[in-house]
Structures are given as C-alpha cells and as structure tokens.
Design a protein with these regions (language model features):
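Exposed acidic/polar residues on beta-strands and adjacent loops within beta-sheet cores, strongest
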Residues: 20-144
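Bacterial N-terminal signal peptides
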Residues: 8-18
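Bacterial N-terminal signal peptides that target proteins for export
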Residues: 1-9
Length: 144
C-alpha cells in the first residue's frame, strides 16, 4: 500500500515543483522603491510604469522593458540631490550580430510622484550590463 502511495506522491511533486518555481514575481518588471511598489506594463506596444493608486507613467521605450538591476538582482538606483533615480531598459538582439539595440530611460522621484526623463539613451550593448552612474544623472540633463 505504501509503494503506490509513494509513487503517487513522487508524481505529484514532479508536477508541482516546476509550477512553484515559475510562480515567483518577475523582479525585472516589478520593484520596490522605498515604500513604493512599482511595475512595468505594456500599453499600446510601449512601456508604462505603474504604481497602485497612481496614474501610469508612459515611457518612450518599446515593450518589453525591464528595470535596471544590480548584480544581486535588486533594483539599482542612485540618489541625485533630493531625488532617487532608477533606469528602465528595453533591448532587442540585432539580426546576424552579437550586439543589441538597447534604449535606456531614467525615472526619478519628484515630490509624491514620478517623472520620466525626456531623453532616451541608445546603446549597442546587451543587458545585463552595469550602466555608468553618469547615465542616472545625464538623461535628465540632456535634451531629447
């Protein structure tokens, strides 16, 4: 009696474990910024940054996009004056090449809201990549 029960239990675990492994949150499209819970979503083929209870912030990046992460997989941010700045990136492989077309847009805290940079940086590099800290500042100082 215990052999069939063990076999049934093993079969159930083989089915359930992969499902559990896939059910975690996607850290590349969901992040915490202090008390804020942020998510990236697709709006008409473009990326939008959404926060519960707030209006969505439409970005200039194509979907899919992701938050720029540090080496440990957490949201990489920089403090610039009174504002916290994060980066959102969208990347696609260049056909017949090892390069990618990557676009980066900065988003900063602004009072109780969020503000996206008007400028977007375009680079030929594939994520994951640790963008220079100047990118966090420069996208707000540049003109589009």
């Amino acid at each position: 009696m215990t052999r069939p029960l063990n076999a049934l239990l093993c079969a159930a675990l083989c089915i359930a474990l992969p499902a559990c492994a896939q059910s975690g949150t996607d850290t590349a499209t969901q992040a915490s910024l202090g008390e804020r819970q942020l998510a990236l979503e697709e709006h008409d083929g473009r990326c939008a940054l959404v926060e519960p209870g707030q209006a969505g912030l439409d970005l200039q990046l194509r979907w899919p996009c992701r938050f720029h992460l540090d080496r440990e997989g957490g949201l990489r941010t920089r403090q610039v004056g009174e504002n916290r700045v994060l980066l959102v990136e969208s990347s696609e492989k260049v056909p017949d090449s090892q390069d990618c077309r990557t676009e980066i847009q900065a988003v900063r805290t602004h009072g109780n809201g969020l503000e996206a940079s008007k400028a977007v940086s375009r680079v030929a590099a594939c994520p994951p990549f640790q963008w220079d800290e100047k990118v966090f500042i420069g996208l707000f100082e540049s003109r589009p």
